[in-house]
Amino acid sequence: YDFFISHAKEDKDTFVRPLVDELNRLGVIIWYDEQTLEVGDSLRRNIDLGLRKANYGIVILSHNFLNKKWTQYELDSLINRAVYDDNKIILPIWHNIN
């Protein structure tokens, strides 16, 4: 994957889906839950795989994001990988945060 999209589900309609649509239009290969996960998949195993295989993590930071456990898990994983690999892999996008 080129990018792993980390976001809160409450931000899908207002920001995430339009971003994903544009990335798909550009031919970017992304890990995005609605495109990647299938019924019966192990959520944690698939998220871990996406986090490991993605070149970069796009993190949609919002008030919703900051209050979720799964998004914190994803962000922590990306930070750990960035520190371990000594590589700038996190691309933050501030969404509706002043």
Listing of model-derived features with the role each one plays in the protein:
Residues 63-65:
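Short glycine-rich anion-binding loops that position phosphate/pyrophosphate groups of nucleotides
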Residues 1-61, 70, 79-89, 94-96:
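Conserved N-terminal substructure of TIR/SEFIR domains
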